[in-house]
């Protein structure tokens, strides 16, 4: 059964998609967000929820979680005209009478216009690649950190040597009972200053070691077995929680099936963010044009233009003059 028609469907529930949905609500149209993950917020919420962001206008600094919470709160003003679909991956969309048919892995949706704000595509964590790892995931094995306080008083082991691994280790030093970092190389890939802080901290550093096995009972991991690189030495580390910080891999395989014009892994757009298909627009990291600057702030600026152009496309005979928000909201 085909879904009811929405004015604008936004593919992607990251910061840019959320702000585009808010602005569409401000303009009085109905909006649907289709997000492939189980939560809104995109990369700031998933990849660096506790890290500080410094380039959002009017905020000297805020975390990825705070940014996401603010955007969701802002959007909630128009919850009566906004529908959110989580854990749905857009496979294809086709032009039909009056708009577009959008097919996901779960359903068929209908929209009069589409705004693509899916960033660099769907992403997933790089895992340890060990047997039984999936059994412990999201119980006491984590690929990203949402709340530091959940590790209070625990023995925490962190695998990884990049910025996130080092930042989490330093942040947990005064919260956890103990913090141990396992890295396959002697040298870390994180910022030099952070590495110096790590080396002078109370964090235990085990290098160069690689994970070999996980031991546990039920859904809880209890020990991580590691082996020294190019040696036979094996250690068993007792733990309460394990954080795997090997980064995330992105995939835009479905994007290539959308029959648009592309520049490398992004969608080519006009100065008004129109793609090669009329009625379909792209913003944020998903959009490519000359002089593009891949910042969240840039995407925030692109969103109103794309929304206004989508409204002009849907309702060409309507008076679509842009009015400031101070005149629209009491």
Swiss-Prot record:
The record, for InterPro entries, names: FAD/NAD-bd_sf (IPR036188), FAD/NAD-binding_dom (IPR023753), Fd--NADP_Rdtase_type_2 (IPR022890), Ferredoxin-NADP_redctase_2 (IPR050097)
Name one molecular function that GO assigns to this entry.
ferredoxin-NADP+ reductase activity
Cofactor: how bound: Binds 1 FAD per subunit.
Q: Does the entry feature the keyword Amino-acid biosynthesis, yes or no?
A: no
EC number(s): the record gives: 1.18.1.2
As its record notes, the protein acts as a catalyst of:
2 reduced [2Fe-2S]-[ferredoxin] + NADP(+) + H(+) = 2 oxidized [2Fe-2S]-[ferredoxin] + NADPH
SUPFAM superfamilies recorded: FAD/NAD(P)-binding domain
Q: Which residues bind FAD?
A: 35, 43, 48, 90, 123, 285, 326
Reading the lineage from the top rank, the first entry is Bacteria
- Looking at the UniProt entry, the stretches that span the membrane are none
The keyword NADP is assigned to this record: yes
Q: Which residues form a coiled coil?
A: none
As cofactor, the record names: FAD
State the UniProt keywords alphabetically: FAD, Flavoprotein, NADP, Oxidoreductase
Q: Which HAMAP family match?
A: FENR2
Q: PANTHER family from the xrefs?
A: THIOREDOXIN REDUCTASE 1-RELATED-RELATED (PTHR48105)
Q: Which family does it belong to?
A: Belongs to the ferredoxin--NADP reductase type 2 family.
| Record text on subunit structure and interactions | Homodimer.
UniProt protein name: Ferredoxin--NADP reductase
Species: Streptococcus pyogenes serotype M5 (strain Manfredo)
């Amino acid at each position: 059964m085909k879904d009811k028609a929405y004015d604008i469907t936004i593919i992607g529930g990251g910061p840019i998609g959320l702000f585009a949905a808010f602005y569409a609500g401000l303009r009085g149209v109905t909006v649907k967000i289709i997000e492939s993950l189980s939560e809104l917020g995109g990369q700031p919420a998933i990849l660096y929820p506790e890290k500080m962001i410094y380039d959002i206008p009017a905020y000297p600094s805020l975390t990825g979680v705070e940014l996401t919470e603010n955007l969701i709160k802002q959007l909630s003003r128009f919850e009566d005209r906004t529908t959110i679909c989580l854990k749905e991956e857009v496979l294809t969309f086709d032009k039909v009478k009056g708009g577009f048919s959008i097919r996901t892995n779960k359903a068929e949706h209908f929209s009069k216009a589409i705004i693509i704000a899916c960033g660099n595509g769907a992403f997933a964590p790089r895992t340890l690649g060990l047997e039984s790892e999936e059994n412990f995931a999201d119980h006491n094995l984590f690929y990203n950190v949402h709340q530091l306080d959940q590790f209070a008083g625990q023995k925490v082991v962190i695998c990884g040597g990049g910025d996130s691994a080092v930042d989490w280790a330093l942040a947990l030093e005064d919260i956890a009972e103990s913090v141990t970092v396992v890295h396959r190389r002697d040298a870390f890939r994180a910022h030099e200053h952070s590495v110096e802080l790590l080396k002078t901290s109370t964090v235990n550093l085990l290098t160069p070691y690689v994970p070999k096995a996980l031991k546990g009972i039920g859904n809880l991991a209890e020990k991580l077995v590691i082996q020294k690189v190019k040696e036979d030495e094996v250690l068993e580390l007792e733990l309460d929680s394990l954080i795997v910080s090997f980064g995330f891999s992105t995939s835009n395989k479905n994007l290539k099936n959308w029959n648009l014009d592309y520049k490398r892994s992004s969608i080519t757009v006009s100065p008004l963010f129109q793609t090669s298909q009329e009625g379909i627009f792209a913003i944020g990291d998903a959009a490519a044009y000359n002089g593009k600057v891949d910042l969240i702030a840039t995407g925030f600026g692109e969103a109103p233009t794309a929304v206004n152009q989508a409204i002009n496309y849907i309702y060409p005979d309507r008076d679509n003059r842009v009015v400031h928000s101070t005149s629209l909201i009491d």
